[in-house]
């Protein structure tokens, strides 16, 4: 009995490690795509904001969600449109960015308060959080590396196979969040060099 219990915890640990590595690789690739195609990324984020707005209106009309929760969500989407005006250069000290961060916290508070009082299945609660609260801030977070002046940038050679694959052989500046991912990659999986 105890042996199977230990095996289950060991397998859970291995599965979490693989999932974490897969998510990190996916984020790295997404950040590369966003840096390469900033205009398309801006358009996609704009469509995501419109979709989130339509979902909020649908929740108000069909599901009778509270007016305050929907109103704050719609105002948050309006602030996100303001962030798109300077995309991909998002200033972390701009009033729009600070206001959007504060509104994310307020939206979460209102959502937790509402779902604590009203019963909805977990899948429906998760759908609300995904489409109305998480997807747009996540898109802006991943795209922070698209602007050259957003995060500190450094020069890195990127001579390994993975970097050459992602950059298609381009040499040059590695910017933003990609520097963080590259640092983490080197810290966790350092490259081996033959010493003669």
From Swiss-Prot:
Any one Gene Ontology cellular component term annotated for this protein: cytoplasm
Keywords noted in UniProt: Membrane, Transmembrane, Transmembrane helix
UniProt GO BP: endoplasmic reticulum to Golgi vesicle-mediated transport; positive regulation of apoptotic process
Topology of this chain in the membrane: Multi-pass membrane protein
GO molecular function: COPII receptor activity
Transmembrane stretches, start-end: 3-23, 42-62, 70-90, 97-117, 125-145
Compartmental location: Membrane
Highest taxon of the lineage: Eukaryota
Expressing tissues: Detected in testis.
Entry keyword annotation includes Plastid: no
Protein family membership: Belongs to the SVP26 family.
Protein name: Protein TEX261
Source organism (scientific name): Mus musculus (Mouse)
């Amino acid at each position: 009995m105890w042996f199977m219990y230990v095996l289950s915890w060991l397998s859970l640990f291995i599965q979490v490690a693989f999932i974490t590595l897969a998510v990190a690789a996916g984020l790295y690739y997404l950040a590369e795509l966003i840096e390469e195609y900033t205009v398309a990324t801006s358009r996609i984020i704009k469509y995501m904001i419109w979709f989130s707005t339509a979902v909020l209106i649908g929740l108000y009309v069909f599901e009778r969600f509270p007016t305050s929760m929907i109103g704050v969500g719609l105002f948050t989407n309006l602030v996100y449109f303001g962030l798109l005006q300077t995309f991909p250069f998002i200033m972390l000290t701009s009033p729009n960015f600070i206001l959007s961060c504060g509104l994310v916290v307020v939206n979460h508070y209102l959502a937790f308060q509402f779902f604590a009082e009203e019963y909805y299945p977990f899948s429906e609660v998760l759908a609300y959080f995904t489409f109305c609260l998480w997807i747009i801030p996540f898109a802006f977070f991943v795209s922070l590396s698209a602007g050259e002046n957003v995060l500190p940038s450094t020069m890195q050679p990127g001579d390994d196979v993975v970097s050459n694959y992602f950059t298609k052989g381009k040499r040059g500046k590695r910017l933003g969040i990609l520097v963080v991912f590259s640092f983490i990659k080197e810290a966790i999986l350092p490259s081996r060099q033959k010493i003669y």
